[in-house]
Structures are given as C-alpha cells and as structure tokens.
C-alpha cells in the first residue's frame, strides 16, 4: 500500500454469490476499478465460474474460511484446517476472518502463511436501516487516503 498514492481499497466479503457478484463485477468493470474479494471456500465450490470471472477480471482474491466460521466457537486446529481447506480452492496469501475477529492463537498460527487484512471502514450495506444513498454518504464522510473499505 503506497501512502503517497491517493487511493482507497475496496473489498467484498462472503462471496461469490450469484445474487450480487455479477452486478458488483459489472459495476467495477464500468468504472475500471479493481477490488479484493474475500471469499468463502464453500461458495467458490458452489459457484466456480463466478470465482473464475473475478480472477479473469484482474481482482485480488482472499481467503475468508471454507464455512464462514467464527474462531471463538472452534478449536484453533479446526479453524486453521477450515482456512487451509478454503485455500485449496482460493489460492491466496490474503486472509480476512469472518466478523473481523479471531483468537490470538489462530492469529499467530495463520500469520505464518497469510497476510491478514482487516479494514477501517464498514459500509454497512447489509443494514435494512440504510439505503444506497446512506451507504455512499457514510463512505464519503469517513473514507481517508488508504482506507480499506468493506
């Protein structure tokens, strides 16, 4: 990440899913924007053509576990194996934990193989209380140079 460059980093979690990924890809293409997609291995298994399209369009891909596991509910080894299983399909050195948290033991285990990427701005596009205009206004208000947006 070059802090001298005026840029933000757009990321998407939990896909690929047919309900939204094609629209996202089309929009990114339209504006010639690249993003990083943190994908769930099981979704990549179900929708391999969407995964292939993300890669073909030149976007970065990251691992978001195979089953979208929360690390506090599972043994460290179980969680780590889920991440490694996802990487058999995703082939990435980037990792983002579901919900943005993980145990310290999981962090220390995974950081040996992965660059762990978090964020500093959540769009809350999933909220039923916000419309598209609210989401855009929040991003405009809180984004700064180098922000990682999810």
Please give the residue ranges for each predicted region:
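Metal-dependent catalytic neighborhoods of phosphoester/phosphodiester hydrolases
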Residues: 49-50, 72-80, 106-109
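Conserved active-site loop/cleft motifs that coordinate metal ions or position small ligands
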Residues: 148-150
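His/Asp/Glu-enriched short active-site or ligand-binding loop at hydrolase and phosphoryl-transfer sites
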Residues: 93, 101, 106-142
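Active-site beta->alpha N-cap acidic-glycine motif
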Residues: 1-70, 91-92
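A short acidic, helix-capping loop that chelates divalent metal ions and anchors anionic groups
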Residues: 68-74, 125-127
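An active-site-proximal "capping" alpha-helix that borders the catalytic cofactor pocket
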Residues: 79-90
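Glycine-enriched alpha-helix->loop->beta-strand junction motifs that scaffold or abut catalytic
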Residues: 31-34, 57-61, 110-119, 145
């Amino acid at each position: 990440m070059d802090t001298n460059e005026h840029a933000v980093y757009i990321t998407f979690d939990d896909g690929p899913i047919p309900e939204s990924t094609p629209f996202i890809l089309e929009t990114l293409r339209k504006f010639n924007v690249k993003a990083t997609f943190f994908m769930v291995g099981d979704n990549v298994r179900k929708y391999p053509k969407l995964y292939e399209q993300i890669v073909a369009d030149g976007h970065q891909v990251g691992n978001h576990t195979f089953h979208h596991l929360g690390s506090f509910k599972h043994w460290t080894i179980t969680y780590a194996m889920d991440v490694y299983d996802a990487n058999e399909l995703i082939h990435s050195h980037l990792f983002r934990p579901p919900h943005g948290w993980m145990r310290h033991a999981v962090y220390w285990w995974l950081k040996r193989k992965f660059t762990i990427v978090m964020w500093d701005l959540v769009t809350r596009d999933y909220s039923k209380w916000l419309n598209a205009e609210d989401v855009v206004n929040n991003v405009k208000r809180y984004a700064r140079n180098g922000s990682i947006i999810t």
